[in-house]
Amino acid sequence: MGPWGEPELLVWRPEAVASEPSVPVGLEVKLGALVLLLLLTLICSLVPVCVLRRSGANHEASASGQKALSLVSCFAGGVFLATCLLDLLPDYLAAIDEALEALHVTLQFPLQEFILAMGFFLVLVMEQITLAYKEQTSPPHPEETRALLGTVNGGPQHWHDGPGIPQAGGTPAAPSALRACVLVFSLALHSVFEGLAVGLQRDRARAMELCLALLLHKGILAVSLSLRLLQSHLRVQVVAGCGILFSCMTPLGIGLGAALAESAGPLHQLAQSVLEGMAAGTFLYITFLEILPQELATSEQRILKVILLLAGFALLTGLLFVQI
């Protein structure tokens, strides 16, 4: 109504309609990132498998191949350590705090740390159940009943289950293979959430920025994951399959995020944060009780291994710093 009681005229402004695009902002960027991430991560996952398989075909190069793989794995261990402490944990804590704040929930109980602990104990319980079942079905070996904090011995290694895959003498394959599967699962789950972060973006510039950062991050992580799996007594075909699975997770998250961009709410974010916290807890266990102890257990080239470990940590730290 006007100031004197007469009805106001409704004025149609074309610019108001034109300002509402029918296509979500950044959709072409998301689709392009989906394809690029799939191809780049797949290539980076399969390159170590192909290189080590070709070099492993020459038995004379086995000894040098073992040492090279161990050194490169130390570099990958630094990448995983930085991923755990500087990427997974901060992302999880920020996401769950934001979800709780959006729901106006105030807790005195340390829920964030409790979820991390549940992910940690999940892997611990799974490993103990696996070891208990293995001991009941076959005569226990002294090396198989060692504590989970124990590391592989410093004895010689031999090539097993195909070229390019070292197996330490006396080291049980079941826990190592289980830890490898948990590692792939935790990284895959986190990759889905990283893809969701891109898919849920409504700003074109921000979506493009996240895509470029993920291209670098996932490329390095894919190489590190393949190197880690090659030391877990898994067949080449299994390692390649894990690489393909890992490569599909971030594009899957981008697709889901683009589809759910309009319906995402605080409850969805809280559920996502809980799953991400469980994944971070499992990754915490794998990093500190599997990757680092195994790489630093032997007495050969200790200083060089530490330098490579720090180099891997510094590389991902610099990448995360550039993202900021």
Swiss-Prot record:
It comes from the Eukaryota. Pfam families: Zip. It catalyses: Zn(2+)(in) = Zn(2+)(out). Residues 52-68, 126-179, 228-237, 294-303 are cytoplasmic. It is found in: Cell membrane; Endoplasmic reticulum membrane. GO terms for molecular function: signaling receptor binding; zinc ion transmembrane transporter activity. GO terms for cellular component: endoplasmic reticulum membrane; plasma membrane. It is a multi-pass membrane protein. The keyword Transmembrane applies. The chain crosses the membrane at residues 31-51, 69-89, 105-125, 180-200, 207-227, 238-258, 273-293, 304-324. GO terms for biological process: embryonic cranial skeleton morphogenesis; in utero embryonic development; limb development; zinc ion transport. This is Zinc transporter ZIP1. It comes from Mus musculus.
